[in-house]
From Swiss-Prot, chains A, B:
Taxonomic lineage: Bacteria, Pseudomonadati, Chlorobiota, Chlorobiia, Chlorobiales
Protein name as annotated: 2-C-methyl-D-erythritol 4-phosphate cytidylyltransferase
Biological processes annotated in GO: isopentenyl diphosphate biosynthetic process, methylerythritol 4-phosphate pathway
PANTHER family per UniProt: 2-C-METHYL-D-ERYTHRITOL 4-PHOSPHATE CYTIDYLYLTRANSFERASE, CHLOROPLASTIC
Keywords per UniProt: Isoprene biosynthesis, Nucleotidyltransferase, Transferase
Length: 240, 240
């Protein structure tokens, strides 16, 4: 099996304030930018052959240099993202689709991942590739630890309580058979329809293919602000 | 204003395996058991006058000794919990209710808290007391960071995606006007009805009193297994 991974990395450029007035362009864990760890996981996943990254125009050179100096040979394209995350993924999908239409060979699966989730393990990525080819679509998730309630009609108060045993928190990488994901994004772009995530998009256009659950632990967190870094460092140390 | 806090601490006795084959009876953070930090927060909250703890029979002496040696003078009773968490809270409520029926004076509010959430701040506890007296009920929560989906009719697949902007993850301490919480628990005990949390119980019997949202950060986590400890240590260090 072979899969292409799309990394949505438009949000990685938030400036990190450090003690002493210094700042860094990228949030770091264990001395490396978050996105470095993310790319390393895909580099080490045996089922992934190519990585496409969508990011802000300002970060393209930075990410290309990082991939080169780290020896991440799977990084094939670093391109500019779009207005919304879905637009960024769509930009990558068009490039994959165009690039492979000549040879007529699409990959078995396409995975879409948040650049800000550095702790996904290579073997988890490989499992998701396998299950998405098998079932059509596969998405990682875990059980919420807290009770979940709706916000009420008065937004300062709670509404109904959801039945927690029926809920999952979902993450990325979300994996799909390549043709299904390309087709779903194509149709969504035509309609101008935006979904919460790629799974919701595929569910809309391929309702007969339920999305397989891949239950992970609690390490696959999303790191977006400096406040997330102490917890991220702890998870990083625990995973080493 | 004055409030009594009920701490549900039946789950604190899980044995923590340490490197080298040693084990400790209680999970620890920063050299103190999780429950020590929890009790300290309530000790330091100016609106809380008394603390009732419900725990396993085996842990009663241990917690009484801990409270005494730490100088936690608000800990009034450490009693045996019941079969379910709700039974444990009900045991404390009956004791509060009986103890105050003679003098005819209930506290303004009763707070119910998970012993395994050590990072609630004293000033947050005081805010929740104030808001629960003002509105009838107040519960802390924060926004889910991940998309939430239902588990499907086939439990290996996802069902519908929930609208994340309408959801809150809820925690404790959950605060209520004393009479409302006592009455709701009394009626639930008569009916034999069990709720997800105390808020759901009060919502059932006092539907005209919507539960106020108190939005917290992401520090108020629940610590239940040794795997939670590295993240907990990181939050502890960041809060110091």
């Amino acid at each position: 099996m072979n899969a292409i991974a799309i990394i949505a990395a438009s949000g990685i450029g938030k400036r990190m304030q450090l003690p002493g007035g210094r700042s860094k362009q990228l949030l770091e864990i264990g001395g490396f930018p978050v996105i470095h760890h993310t790319l390393k996981a895909f580099e080490d996943a045996s089922q992934v052959t190519e990585v496409y990254i969508a990011t802000k125009a300002d970060n393209i050179d930075l990410l290309q240099d990082m991939a080169r100096s780290a020896g991440f040979r799977k990084v094939r394209h670093v391109i500019e993202g779009g207005k919304e995350r879905q637009d960024s993924v769509w930009n990558c999908i068009r490039m994959i689709s165009d690039g492979h239409s000549g040879a007529g060979e699409l990959p078995d699966a396409i995975l879409v991942h948040d650049g800000a989730r550095p702790f996904i393990r290579p073997e988890e990525i490989d499992d998701i590739v396998r299950l998405s080819v098998e079932s059509g679509a596969c998405v990682p998730g875990n059980r919420p630890k807290d009770t979940i309630k709706y916000i009420g009609s008065d937004p300062s108060c709670f509404g109904a309580t959801l039945e927690r045993s029926r809920l999952m928190q979902v993450q990325t990488p979300q994996g799909f058979r390549a043709g299904m994901l390309i087709d779903a994004h194509h149709r969504a772009a035509e309609e101008g329809w935006y979904a919460t995530d790629d799974a919701a998009l595929v569910e809309r256009y391929f309702p007969d293919y339920p999305v397989r659950i891949y239950e992970t632990g609690y390490h696959n967190i999303k790191i977006t602000t400096p406040e997330d870094i102490p917890v991220a460092e702890a998870i990083y140390q625990a995973l080493l």
